[in-house]
Amino acid sequence: MSITEEIRKQAIKNAYLHDGRADVKSVVSKLMAEFPEARKNPGDLINDVKKCVDEINSMGKDRIIEIINNEYPEFKIKEKKEEKHELPELPNAKNGVVMRMAPSPSGPLHIGHSRMAILNDEYVKRYGGDLILRIEDTNPGNIDIDAYDMIPEDLKWLDVNVTKTVIQTSRMDLYYREAKKLIENGYMYIAETDQKRFKELKLKSMALPDRSMDPGVHLDRFDKMLNREYREGEAVAVLKTDLNHPNPSIRDWIAFRISYKRHPLTGDEYCVYPMMNFSVAIDDHYLGLTHVIRGMDHLVNTEKQKYIFNYNNWKLPYYYHYGIIKIPGSVLKTSIIKNGIKSGKYTGWDDVRLGTIRALRKRGYRPETFRRYWINSGMKETGATFSWEIFDSINRQLIDRDAMRFFFVNDPVLLDLNNDIDLESHARYHPDIDLGYRKYIIKSHSRIYLSRRDLDDIKPDEIFRLKDLCVVKRTEDGIAYIDDDSNKRLKIIQWCPENSHEFTVQKPDGTVDSGMLEPLAYNYNGVSQFERYGYVNIINRNGYFLHR
């Protein structure tokens, strides 16, 4: 078998194994490893592989599978039954569950939040019951008023079915009532001390003098807190736990604090706010939570919250904690995003450089991609790193059959096409599905756009193919038409006619590609594949890079 035939064979195999897209580096590495003669002229080998890969990647998956079946059956992969990923069963769930999502309204949801939302939603859909959206807004200094609307919008787009919405600041009277009950029963006290001394004593497993005072004193102090008779930091409500607990953070922990910051939703109505662990425990009981699913970072919080359940003789929900997922290459922290929006660095919460649900939606990810990824990840307790490669692969499977194909020429160069006859281009909108053709008439002696990068790779007098148009040769003053022979095995590159439109593609790394987009794509809206470039979401004549 000649090296040319071997290149084609390995490129076909590589494309077959990788969703219809061969990779030049992988094919070259394979050839050099298995065929010593291929190492003699690596430059020529790389160019030959590029030509072959361009041709194969333009075929479409169905055609590649056909070639494998007819020419290289030894490469066929035995079809396996698609592995069905399912979440584990929950105990005592057959009669329905009550579960919750509890985001803070500091901003919209990001990709990490989608895990919590989807796992809870999957179980409620499996067993029936209620999925509660509880907006935890008891920290007045960290609230974005728009988040009260953005969070439900994000969940709706993710196809998460919320059956009830609860806002914690509408339940303050409940928190105050439960606090007074705990004080009366000797489980909570009001500490009139500064934070530094409080922490120092906790680390030594020592009690504040306030701890042993009569509950009546603490009820009076709590009323003074509510009546604004303390300054911020002068008094806090503390839940009694075990001062000898091995984890200092679980020893007597603060349950209420004073804040005179104006709340974006309730204004100045309240000045005493429950800390997260207090309000969560109260709500989980009164909302009837049966099962709680959240990250391993909440393990300590769960231990803290159990004290309130035990003091009140309340039935505990079932707790599940999944491992922490590190999400690389994505901006998620709300404070960083807010500051970036204020400074003009980011255009908004949907800036494609961010990891918010809105940004990923804008780029063109499908809601089902999030669901499949998190179900596949399951509820393992071990930590892991989020795989954008797997996430993109899932999304590619969902979008590919609907994605129209178009030509986009990045960093374009306008060249004379020396053709004595009119040429006609018939390019399929999709290689595997009959969606029709994009038709262009290229008049004699027209001009077309090629990418500067492609042009730099073409040697003088080199013959190559303009995809779905004709065979041409590089000349000193442009390119010259040779023929329409579609059977020649040549390097294939995309092009755009002279009447194409200027177009930009914003990328998640912050760069912007500027080029020309073929006329029939200019008014298109939705995810499309720019051939030899990648998938792009077009929104009102603006392009947002999705993935390759």
Swiss-Prot record:
* Keyword tags: Aminoacyl-tRNA synthetase, ATP-binding, Cytoplasm, Ligase, Nucleotide-binding, Protein biosynthesis
UniProt xrefs under InterPro entries: aa-tRNA-synth_I_CS, Gln/Glu-tRNA_Ligase, Glu-tRNA-synth_arc/euk, Glu/Gln-tRNA-synth, Glu/Gln-tRNA-synth_Ib_cat-dom, Glu/Gln-tRNA-synth_Ib_codon-bd, Rbsml_bL25/Gln-tRNA_synth_N, Ribosomal_bL25/Gln-tRNA_synth
Where does this polypeptide localize?
Answer: Cytoplasm
Give me any GO biological process, just one. Answer: amide biosynthetic process
The main location is: cytoplasm
- Report the SS bond pairs: none
Q: Where is this motif: 'HIGH' region?
A: 103-113
GO CC annotation: what is one?
A: protein-containing complex
The reply on keyword Nucleotide-binding is yes
| Protein's UniProt keywords contain Ligase | yes
- GO molecular-function terms, A-Z: ATP binding; glutamate-tRNA ligase activity
Q: What Enzyme Commission number does this protein have?
A: 6.1.1.17
What reaction gets catalysed by this protein? tRNA(Glu) + L-glutamate + ATP = L-glutamyl-tRNA(Glu) + AMP + diphosphate
- Fetch the NCBIfam families from UniProt: gltX_arch (TIGR00463), PRK04156.1 (NF003169)
Record function comment: Catalyzes the attachment of glutamate to tRNA(Glu) in a two-step reaction: glutamate is first activated by ATP to form Glu-AMP and then transferred to the acceptor end of tRNA(Glu).
| Family indicated by similarity | Belongs to the class-I aminoacyl-tRNA synthetase family. Glutamate--tRNA ligase type 2 subfamily.
Q: What is this protein called?
A: Glutamate--tRNA ligase
Upper lineage: Archaea, Methanobacteriati, Thermoplasmatota, Thermoplasmata, Thermoplasmatales
Q: Which gene codes for it?
A: gltX
